């Protein structure tokens, strides 16, 4: 069969899994008065359709910001408005001001699920296919396998089609941006990433690698020649993109500031709910939120985030390469997730996207990370009654990855991209030849722990005095895994001596 035929089969399989998951429950189903993210997305459609633009982000009698107030950038609001027009055409009751609050029906659920699928088909899935086809030095079969594994990644499917969100939009735009700048379509790549950033502010997790990669390109071209011209063109593209997205909100200074305040609610504290990052895990032993003033918490969070991502960003600026860019995206996004302020459990998807992009380069570690990332959201998925689809999609993903990228056949020092690091260590410890075995043991320990915690969470009730015991354990175990991955990816980046050979010549 032609590769395009196989790719069509892959897409159809991915769509089938997505739609099957969408038949299950969603966030806040039948749980008044606040319901959940499903109601939040519906409510934003109600607000954007019935209120003028200037009232979208302000508290009023018609727009109670305490009830799922709009807190995403303008592009999300425009998307909500577009969906609202379609909803009003089908059934005005779905988006009627005030009276539609908490609206639930099978017809409305079908509509909402369809809007997610449409966004996926228009933005995310085409980007995945084009990215896989653009991969160099791998066979067509491996490109198809890569597309299959990426489209079967359970974390994104369960959150968008189960819990209910539109993460595929921002992640899709970000992937188009990665494609653009990796193929030297720098202006298109910059535009795509600006769209991602104006859809979800959490795309800031990816912003520094984009900036450093493009800046490094400008340096390589020479700031006195083509480099300065490229820098100016990119800057103009970014400014123009933001102006177009924010234009309705720039008529008054207070209006723009209110949008910014809604996007970055520092008053909420270091973290919300149970999230697998450093601050939530540390909170088990040391109540940082109670001990330190909020401005000190923000300062500490900023310092740790900045210091953890600085080495990779410096190397990417000095040695810009498509490979280095992909790995730095992983490292920086993971640094933000572990150390930054106001992290949500679903933000791990921002790390998972670039990990999917290096799946063909380090299949063992990528598959392991993607499994842990899905496991880290288990408390949320159980809350939404998504246990069965979680187990099935994880198994399907694991089978696909194990079939096309055999797990333990990809754990040599070369395949883990740790050869340079191991050689450096052996200069001081000649007997250091067991690194692959260590990695395999850590993987098995991680998987066994995840399976045990999943079984315990489902079969046992936590002690009355410790109602969040299993959720905290899941977050803590996931955090330990993520710290290990952060160290691993930084080692790969800093000890990579192949950038010069892998880097395309920048004229």
UniProtKB/Swiss-Prot annotation:
The UniProt record lists the keyword Glycoprotein: yes
EC number: 2.4.1.267
Pathway where this protein functions: Protein modification; protein glycosylation
An annotated GO BP: dolichol-linked oligosaccharide biosynthetic process
Sugar-modified residues: 59
UniProt catalytic activity: an alpha-D-Man-(1->2)-alpha-D-Man-(1->2)-alpha-D-Man-(1->3)-[alpha-D-Man-(1->2)-alpha-D-Man-(1->3)-[alpha-D-Man-(1->2)-alpha-D-Man-(1->6)]-alpha-D-Man-(1->6)]-beta-D-Man-(1->4)-beta-D-GlcNAc-(1->4)-alpha-D-GlcNAc-diphospho-di-trans,poly-cis-dolichol + a di-trans,poly-cis-dolichyl beta-D-glucosyl phosphate = an alpha-D-Glc-(1->3)-alpha-D-Man-(1->2)-alpha-D-Man-(1->2)-alpha-D-Man-(1->3)-[alpha-D-Man-(1->2)-alpha-D-Man-(1->3)-[alpha-D-Man-(1->2)-alpha-D-Man-(1->6)]-alpha-D-Man-(1->6)]-beta-D-Man-(1->4)-beta-D-GlcNAc-(1->4)-alpha-D-GlcNAc-diphospho-di-trans,poly-cis-dolichol + a di-trans,poly-cis-dolichyl phosphate + H(+)
InterPro entries for the chain: Glyco_trans_ALG6/ALG8
Subcellular localization: Endoplasmic reticulum membrane
An annotated Gene Ontology molecular function: glucosyltransferase activity
PANTHER family: DOLICHYL GLYCOSYLTRANSFERASE (PTHR12413), DOLICHYL PYROPHOSPHATE MAN9GLCNAC2 ALPHA-1,3-GLUCOSYLTRANSFERASE (PTHR12413:SF1)
Family: Belongs to the ALG6/ALG8 glucosyltransferase family.
Protein name stated in the entry: Dolichyl pyrophosphate Man9GlcNAc2 alpha-1,3-glucosyltransferase
């Amino acid at each position: 069969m032609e590769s395009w035929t196989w790719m069509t089969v892959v897409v159809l399989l991915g769509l089938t899994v997505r739609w099957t998951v969408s038949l299950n429950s969603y966030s806040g189903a039948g749980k008044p008065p606040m319901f959940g993210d499903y109601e939040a997305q519906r409510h934003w459609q109600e607000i954007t359709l019935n209120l003028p633009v200037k009232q979208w982000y302000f508290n009023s009698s018609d727009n109670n910001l305490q009830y799922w107030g709009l807190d995403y950038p303008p592009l999300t609001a425009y998307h909500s408005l577009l969906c609202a027009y379609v909803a009003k055409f089908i059934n005005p009751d779905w988006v009627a001001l005030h009276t539609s609050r908490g609206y639930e029906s099978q017809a409305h659920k079908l509509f909402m699920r369809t809007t997610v699928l449409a966004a996926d088909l228009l933005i995310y899935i085409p980007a995945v296919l084009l990215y896989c086809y653009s991969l160099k030095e791998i066979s067509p079969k491996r490109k198809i396998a890569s597309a299959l594994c990426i489209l079967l990644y359970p974390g994104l499917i369960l959150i968008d089609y189960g819990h209910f969100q539109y993460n595929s939009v921002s992640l899709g735009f970000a992937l188009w941006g990665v494609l653009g700048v990796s193929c030297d379509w720098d202006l298109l790549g910059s535009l795509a990433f600006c769209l991602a950033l104006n859809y979800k502010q959490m795309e800031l997790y990816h912003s520094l690698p984009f900036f450093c990669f493009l800046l490094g390109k400008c340096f390589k071209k020479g700031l006195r020649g083509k480099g300065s011209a490229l820098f100016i063109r990119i800057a103009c593209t970014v400014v123009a993109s933001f102006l177009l997205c924010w234009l309705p909100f720039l008529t008054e200074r207070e209006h723009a500031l209110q949008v910014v305040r809604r996007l970055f609610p520092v008053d909420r504290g270091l973290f919300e709910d149970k999230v697998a990052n450093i601050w939530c895990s540390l909170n088990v032993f040391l109540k940082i939120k109670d001990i330190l003033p909020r401005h000190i918490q923000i300062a500490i969070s900023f310092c740790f985030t900045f210091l953890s991502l600085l080495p990779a960003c410096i190397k990417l600026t000095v040695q810009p390469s498509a490979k280095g860019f992909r790995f730095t995206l992983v490292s920086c996004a993971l640094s933000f997730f572990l150390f930054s302020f106001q992290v949500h459990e679903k933000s791990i998807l921002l790390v998972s996207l670039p990990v999917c992009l290096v799946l063909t380069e380090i299949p063992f570690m990528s598959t392991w990370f993607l499994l842990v990332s899905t496991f880290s959201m288990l408390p949320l998925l159980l809350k939404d009654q998504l246990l069965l689809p979680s187990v099935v999609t994880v198994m399907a993903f694991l089978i696909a990855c194990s079939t096309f990228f055999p797990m333990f056949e990809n754990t040599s020092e070369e395949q883990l991209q740790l050869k340079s690091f191991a050689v450096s260590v052996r200069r001081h410890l000649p007997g250091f030849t067991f690194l692959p075995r260590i990695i395999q043991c850590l993987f098995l320990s991680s998987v066994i722990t995840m399976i045990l915690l999943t079984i315990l969470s489902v079969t046992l009730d936590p002690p009355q005095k410790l109602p969040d015991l299993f959720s905290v354990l899941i977050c803590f175990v996931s955090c330990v895994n993520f710290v290990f991955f952060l160290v691993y990816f930084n080692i790969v980046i800093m000890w990579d001596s192949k950038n010069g050979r892998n880097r395309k010549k920048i004229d």
